[in-house]
Regions:
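Basic/polar N-terminal segments that are highly enriched at the extreme N-terminus
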Residues: 1-10, 22-28, 166-173
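Conserved alpha-helical segments that form or flank metal/cofactor-binding pockets of metalloenzymes
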Residues: 44-72, 91-101
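Long amphipathic alpha-helical coiled-coil segments
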Residues: 68-82, 148-156
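Acidic interhelical loop/turn segments
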Residues: 31-38, 97-129, 161
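Amphipathic alpha-helices that form helix-helix packing interfaces
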Residues: 13-16, 20-23, 27, 55, ...
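Alpha-helical scaffold segments that form or flank carboxylate-/histidine-based iron centers
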Residues: 2-16, 35-57, 75-84, 120-136, ...
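C-terminal or internal capping secondary-structure element at the end of a domain, subdomain, or sheet
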Residues: 126-171
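Hydrophobic/aromatic-lined pockets within catalytic cores
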Residues: 21, 25-28, 56, 60-63, ...
């Protein structure tokens, strides 16, 4: 099997959303579930709900870049667990609508790419994915996990990686 740009970006993003969805489910089952939505690692950091929003937005920004569309940010208004699930589902739906052949081709195409206010750089889709999108996605997934752990939510490494490992496991696992 050949590992492609599609696998490294789209499939990995789908797996990250699966992991994030699992974290949301576990958080909602906790006695302090309502407090977890606004929990932060540190006062100047974004809360758990925003980590979910930013992970989904990172995926949407990548897909816009690969589709040569302008990304229009969605306001961060997630206030309930249902809001979090809908945001994850929206990003999942966009990922599921991608075409493997098209994504693989777009990974090699170079275009002006917005990185932050005042910084647009000409780069390939693959360079944007590997240098910005995927690290940001994994950062926000990791922060969501860390926030929950800091609040005493009983999570282990398996809770984080299980969706990444599913393709390698026997179907009974």
């Amino acid at each position: 099997m050949v590992y492609t740009f599609y696998d490294a970006s789209i499939v990995a993003a789908q797996q990250a959303l699966g992991s994030l969805s699992h974290l949301v489910d576990v958080a909602e089952q906790q006695p302090n579930a309502s407090e977890l939505l606004t929990a932060r690692l540190y006062e100047d950091m974004r809360p758990f709900s925003s980590q979910v929003h930013l992970a989904a937005q990172t995926i949407e920004r990548l897909l816009c870049r690969l589709d040569n569309r302008e990304h229009v940010p969605i306001e961060d208004t997630l206030a309930t667990y249902e809001d979090l699930r809908q945001r994850i589902q929206s990003a999942r739906k966009e990922l599921d609508g991608t075409d493997k052949e098209t994504i693989n081709k777009r990974g090699d195409e170079s275009a002006p790419t917005w990185l932050m206010p005042g910084m647009t750089v000409d780069m390939t889709g693959a360079a944007f994915a590997s240098g910005a999108s995927m690290p940001n996605l994994f950062f926000h997934l990791s922060m969501a996990y860390a926030i929950l752990r800091a609040q005493g939510v009983p999570l282990g490494k398996w809770d984080y990686i299980q969706d990444f490992m599913k393709p390698q496991l026997p179907s009974a696992a």
